[in-house]
Amino acid sequence: MKNPDVIVVGGGPAGAACAWFLAGQGARVSVLDRARFPRDKPCSEYLSPEASRILSVMSALAPIEEAGAAHLSGMRIRSPNGTTFQGDFVAAHGWRGYSDRGVAIRRTILDACLLDRARAAGASVEEGVRVTDVIRDSRGRVRGVCTLGEDGSNRERTAPLVVAADGLRSVISRRLCLARRARFPRRLALVTHYEGIEDVSGYGEMHVEKDGYAGIAPVGNGAVNVAVVIPARGAAALAGDRAGFLGRWIAARPHLAPRFRNARRITPVHATGPFASHAHRAWAPGVALVGDAADFFDPFTGEGIYAALRGAELLAPALLQSLSASSVVRADAALWEYDESRNKEFRGKWRVERLIGAAVSVPLLMNTAAGSLSRRKEMADLLVGVAGDFVPPREVLNVSFVTRLVVDALLGMAPLERHRSVTAANAGRVPASPAI
């Protein structure tokens, strides 16, 4: 496309959705991606109940359903000591999402479908094009990108606005020094697909261990997404053998290994990470960040695809406003407002994610929290509803919820302490002689 209004770098959910929203309003949009679709992507491949609303708006929900997407009714979480709790999306708390179930679908299907919707709206999509740098004018304003084609050709492409939807290791974010790597938690993930895993149900599963965690979820057509997330310091243990490491990790878990005895891995093992990246702001003059390029903390809550879609929905109106602005100052103000609205939208969820990330990193804390949530189903439902993006984070980020969690944890520990006291007392007694 010649003279686009917006260049979108990245054709994943964030980029495709942004292109769809923009093109539908008459903007000239060029989407660039270094991959050729369909392509696989290491991801939990889970879309929360609220993500279905945006898919429906894009007329993408029906094609995804027809492609065989799996449906999830909630989440089951197992702590390191074996305590398990379950949260359901449909629950007594009364909050309801756009859908009563989450959706799980292979990225090979999802991304191709969303890109097709962007094309149908009028966006130009170029595959096999890698963005290598940004173009800036004399004042430092972004005016386009430099690209490298599969044939080795270099090209400069210009546009009034650029969208960085190029993921966790965003080239644009790095070039503009917008990204910050957090020190905690530093994790990486190994992701693959199996068929034939036993006892797979209509729930997503998270199995937390002392040295990482595993996620298991059906993604339709008999395939099951399996992700093992480990501390980044354990990367050396992979030793170039991702599949072997993942197999050994699962085999070492007595509660998981039997379920895989007749399973067959059907896709290569992909690696991604380290995670915990956050842009100190999601815009700069002439450019805006969306999706993982703007923020990605940890995959445990599986919010990445919803955040990408919702972020694109927030960004598109700001880009249109920026394009029609009467001055550079007003154009930048529109991007600043996007950043503010994004922070307002996701701030509560970010706090919940970080609290969960802390619990996952400390086995004692995770065991204690799991014990409370296993006894308080209504609290587990609320927490899973927040993760499902339809229960407001304030429902768990309040004194009442935290107090109930702590009190229940203390009450749950009390019988154990009494048992220990009795055991210790009995250990010091001399058994009475039997009566004759």
Predicted segment positions?
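N-terminal Rossmann-like FAD-binding beta1-loop-alpha1 element of flavoenzymes
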Residues: P4-S30
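Conserved Rossmann-like nucleotide-cofactor binding loop
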Residues: A14, F37, R169
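N-terminal FAD cofactor-binding segment of flavoenzymes
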Residues: P42-N81
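C-terminal helical "tail/cap" subdomain of flavin- and related membrane-associated enzymes
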Residues: L320-I436
